[in-house]
Amino acid sequence: MAAGKSYKLQSPSGSVSVEIAVGQDVTWTVSRDGTRVLEPSAISMTLEDGSVWGQNVKVRKTAKRSVSRDLTPWVYRQSSVRESYNELTLQCSGYSMVFRAYDMGAAYRFVAARKEPFKVKEEKASFCFAGNFSAFIPYTREVKDYDSQFSTSCESQYTREPIGQWRKDKIAFLPITVEALDGMKVCITESDLLNYPGMYLSNPDGDNALEAVFPRYPKDIEQGGHNMLQGIIKSREDYLAEVSAQEAFPWRIVIVSKEDKELLTCDIPWLLGREPAPEMDFSWVKPGKVAWDWWNAWNLYGVDFEAGVNNATYKYYIDFAAKNGIEYVILDEGWAVNKKADLFQVVPEIDLPMLCEYAAGKGVGLILWAGYWAFEKDMEKACREYSEMGVKGFKVDFMDRDDQPMIQFYRRAAETAARYHLMVDFHGAFKPSGLQRTWPNVINYEGVYGLENVKGNKKYEIDLVTYEVSIPFVRLVAGPSDYTQGAMRNATRKNFRYVSSEAMSQGTRCRQLAEYVVFDAPLNMLCDSPSNYLKEQECLKFIADVPTVWDQTVALEGKAGEYVAVARRKGDTWYVGALTDWNARELTLDLSFIGGVPLMEVFRDGANAHRAARDYKHEWKEFPLDGKVSVKMAPGGGWAAVFRPEPQPWENTDKDWARYSYYEEKNKDVETRPRAVLFGDSITRNWVREDRRWLKNHNFVGRGISGQTTAQLLCRIRPDVIDLNPEYMVLLIGINDIARNNGYISVENTFGNIVSMVQLAQANGIKPVMCTLCPAREIGWRKRVGDPRPMIDKLNALISAYAKENGIPLVDYNSALRIPDGSMDPRYETDAVHPNKDGYKVMEQTLLSVLEKL
């Protein structure tokens, strides 16, 4: 094909366009809505034999394809992700260049097509801009020479300055967000980084172009660094990577947002990660929260033992976690003998088998901290033996590199841990780059200037408040972060001090709570001491209850470096979090999409939070009819709220305890006799949301209310069932009695209420259909009730026996959705209690198979 050829590619909606110019060089240009955001930028790859991909190019063949599909992640901030892009492949001699256009960005990669493995000498990836735009730049920290900058934990505050003022001797790690034309933001990152060094950016010429730089392949590595746990590079080769003949190189990504808040929910980096192997089952991966020891320096008080790295301390942490529904406890640095880099030399004060057994008996998992060198040395043995002991994962720390061998270590660690059903939390790490999609047991990454820096990092001036309203638009675009929030000691800007053993956060108490909503973190730390949390029960309950993975995430408001507000849904419950910079701020959030919630639980900055950052107000407020909620934040403040459809203790005194009003208007619209009323709680209510058409097609009416118990259904059976005069009443209820949503009730009394409703239906000429309760391994909003499976089985046995003795049809949802351990099949659940769309399909078939026989 002739030189000088130009190719064009557009995203599915046409919002993003890519132009590729091919000839003596290859350049790509990216525009959004007609505005060019990336000027022609050269790309190439130089091999060890001197050949250059991307110079004097002859395209032999082109191929286009379009993809539009819904994906179900194992672990993510959404239960469903829409993937939609157009792709162009330019096939050349020995390689291809693949370009993709999404509606919010574009990406490219090189793919080898050779017969033998080879080495990559250099790669050119330019990012050219039309002006000297400002950017959020995470420079590596000060080191003695240029090459040493590649030994980094990727923890730096942002320097916000024009790219033309880039420090010539400095490099910066990814992501970087550039403030471009017309208020647009351009975020640069990478994904599918599995066998190649990580990309950094530099600007050696001081112009409007950023250039990629990469750590060269290590030649000599010595054990050293922090407690002899790091690999120290002594010399490097003159090439970047050794790769396979068919190597698919990492994606180079340019994300373009018209509004800053679009960056908060951009899925492109995750989508460009490699899909897990189809035969892999990651249902065993259990996200959750962790009681952490290191940040609070094992600082317990009011106990009758000396706190520290010992059995008594960790049993206390385990008891604390169990009592408050916290899934994990971490044993951070100190459980293994110092400076030995040996995970099997345990200090005498720690009895790991005993602690694992003790934790398991309390329903708590243990996670072990491991230095890089020690974990690399004994990876297989450590994973095998500690998984057999009952350990649930490793927090692997102090890698502080992303050359090719280190990238390969990450992948090997993920693969090995997965074989033994272990999670991995990488600290001293680079940003997420797709591995967390390929191996969902990679549950979190650090690579962030987190709260640990308040413990005494006096070398650098610290401003975490500004940083915290910047990372959602930069670092978190790449993926989740282990920021480790949750401090109960809080300080204003003026009052902040470094106190290592009794550390404090910058900003208000409510800020710490809101960060659990704003920041993505499938494994989320509680950084403070159990002793401090136990004095702050309201805050502890909020943190313990907040989910770590979500069904839906909505970006509400945001301006990078100034403020951010996010809403997230898990099941029927919504959480909203907002943060501001050092300026007091008031936002009006449009939450009308939530709906159906009478009250909201709010944590807001107190009237004196600008002076005493711990000051906050916890209250329940009516949810406005128009859904517009005013949010006021103090300097360095935050705001958090929960919107629960199920009744809470404060609702017990409400005049409409039974929620008669919920369906009052809808009942007036029922003109024809329903074939059946499906009567129940949130499982029935969600059915309407998930498959309204199916209900309508079968003349079924849904009358479920989230959180309700048998006592409440018994109150409203007349208006919501009897007065509608259906042929059948399909009764599915009882899980919220077991959860004690309205306080204690025995299984026998729950069953008695069910029988009363059956008899009321019969007395009014309605045929009852009884249902077994769906399986559930835990009740997320009431974890303190313990394992619900024995009570579910007991209640189901009573229901089944009564139905059989009295000739009443029985729909056995439990058997249809259950796996051998009594849990709901992971294919059918959203949160251990509630079915997903596939679960409802199974329930529909099960119900119809019974009704068709009547």
Please tell me what each predicted stretch does:
Residues 5-273:
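N-terminal accessory beta-strand-rich subdomains and adjacent acidic, glycine-rich linkers
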Residues 528-575, 579, 610-614:
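Glycan-recognition and catalytic regions of carbohydrate-active enzymes
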Residues 559-599, 639-641:
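Carbohydrate-binding surface patches
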Residues 620-647:
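C-terminal beta-strand-rich structural cap/linker in extracellular carbohydrate-active enzymes
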Residues 648-679, 684-694, 723-724, 852-854:
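N-terminal secretory targeting modules
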Residues 774-854:
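Catalytic His-Asp segment of secreted/periplasmic serine-dependent ester chemistry enzymes
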